[in-house]
A protein has these predicted regions:
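Mid-domain catalytic core of redox enzymes
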Residues: 36-171
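A conserved beta-strand/loop element that lines the FAD pocket in flavoprotein oxidoreductases
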Residues: 27-38
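Short, well-ordered alpha-helix to beta-strand connector turns
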Residues: 4, 28-29, 61-62, 190-191
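Conserved flavin/dinucleotide-binding core of flavoenzymes
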Residues: 127-223
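A structural signal for the hydrophobic beta-strands that form the central parallel beta-sheet
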Residues: 32-34, 66, 195
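Short, small-residue-biased leader/transition segments that mark boundaries at the very start
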Residues: 1-8
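Short active-site alpha-helical segment characteristic of glycosyltransferases
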Residues: 20
Length: 223
């Protein structure tokens, strides 16, 4: 049900992904505004207007960078171009229910094949693959029992071993989407607008960071 004997060795951050987010925002934390949702973005050749919920006047900027999901960016744009519609619509997100639990029956029967990501196939081609992350491996947890996160599970998990359920949205990769990824230059950098997010790569945190670095390069900045 999962990886073979040649399990990849991964490097992980102590404290999980939260630790690198804290490091990245160290220099500008006071410029991050929470509980101030953006509801609309209007663009002109000379400026960008950002409208926030319950605020009558827009905030003016020279440029806008969308560090959001592709569908969220498209929804916020007041006047998306045909290229923006075509590319962003081809890179959709889908909702997944993530279940945090301790039921190791979702893991491979042979323990030495346990890996960070483990797939379970039902044989039903109309049913999505069940994916289980082993958090003990991913976050170097020295803990008992094994803490797992499973996506797209249909009743395989023992109810007594469920800790929490969370709704997430993840990139949905298709052949059309792979072609759309190659057209990023047609929309990012146009109309004073730039796009970054994990959907430009394979959906990993690293892909999100790499796409952000691409935007930095567009501004002549290297990190």
């Amino acid at each position: 049900s999962s990886a073979a004997s040649d399990v990849y060795k991964r490097q992980v951050l102590k404290g999980g992904s939260k630790s690198y987010v804290e490091k990245i925002i160290e220099g500008f934390q006071e410029k991050i505004f929470l509980s101030r949702p953006v509801i609309k973005v209007e663009r002109s050749p000379s400026e960008v207007k950002i409208y926030c919920d319950k605020e009558p006047d827009p905030i003016l900027f020279d440029k806008v960078i969308f560090a959001t999901h592709s569908d969220q960016a498209l929804e916020l744009l007041e006047d998306p171009s045909d290229d923006e519609k075509s590319v962003l619509e081809a890179l959709p997100y889908q909702k997944n229910t993530a279940i945090v639990h301790t039921d190791v029956s979702l893991m491979p029967k042979i323990k030495k094949t346990w890996s960070s990501w483990n797939y379970l196939l039902s044989g039903d081609l109309n049913r999505p693959v069940t994916l289980t992350y082993n958090m003990n491996i991913l976050q170097s947890l020295d803990a008992k029992p094994d803490f797992l996160v499973t996506l797209n599970s249909l009743n395989e998990i023992s109810p007594s071993k469920i800790i929490k359920k969370v709704e997430y949205s993840h990139p949905l990769f298709t052949v059309r989407g792979i072609h759309a990824q190659k057209k990023k230059s047609q929309i990012s950098g146009h109309k004073n607008t730039y796009y970054c997010g994990a959907y430009w790569g394979n959906g990993f945190h690293e892909d999100g960071v790499n796409s952000a670095l691409d935007v930095c390069k567009a501004f002549g900045v290297s990190l």
